[in-house]
Amino acid sequence: MIIGIGTDIVEIDRINKSIERTPNFINKLFTKKEIEYFISRKMRPEFIAGKFAAKESVAKALGTGFRKFGFRDIEIDKDELGKPLVHLSGGAKETANKFGDYKLHLSISHGRENAIAYAILEVDNNGNCNSSKDEGHR
């Protein structure tokens, strides 16, 4: 059963300007692994904006926004085929654990001007999710 959805759209230029104005912008919002990914992609702003939108959409799907945790408590990764995965820690994980065994689904895309992400938080009707714990959740 779907118990939360979230979507976010970000202007890539807005993210680019934030990076230019705030030297610590990347380090404040992204994990070491995410930053390594950005570096491997030559710090292209569309990838940064996509992960930013993904974190926002996950926070919305959890139903709290960022009131109980920070951006770095949500890490966006990908599997070997490029499918986006979500790894939660800290307050984000505590919030998600209240739902029991859960699964987060995530889609990220971008064009020239915008990046968008859509997240779904799923549990079964008993508050449990039957999927493996290695698929980008918990």
From Swiss-Prot:
The family annotation for this protein states: Belongs to the P-Pant transferase superfamily. AcpS family.
Q: Which residues bind Mg(2+)?
A: 8, 56
**Cellular component aspect of the GO annotation:** cytoplasm
Q: Where is the protein situated, by its record's location annotation?
A: Cytoplasm
State the HAMAP family in the record.
AcpS
Q: Which cofactor does it need?
A: Mg(2+)
Query: Which EC number(s) does UniProt give?
Result: 2.7.8.7
According to the UniProt entry, its GO molecular function terms are: holo-[acyl-carrier-protein] synthase activity; magnesium ion binding
Q: List the protein's name.
A: Holo-[acyl-carrier-protein] synthase
The species is Clostridium novyi (strain NT)
Task: Give the record's keywords alphabetically.
Answer: Cytoplasm, Fatty acid biosynthesis, Fatty acid metabolism, Lipid biosynthesis, Lipid metabolism, Magnesium, Metal-binding, Transferase
Quote the function comment for this protein.
Answer: Transfers the 4'-phosphopantetheine moiety from coenzyme A to a Ser of acyl-carrier-protein.
Q: Name one GO biological process term.
A: fatty acid biosynthetic process
Q: Which reaction does it catalyse?
A: apo-[ACP] + CoA = holo-[ACP] + adenosine 3',5'-bisphosphate + H(+)
Which top class of enzyme applies to this chain?
transferase
What is the first-listed, main subcellular location in coarse terms? Answer: cytoplasm
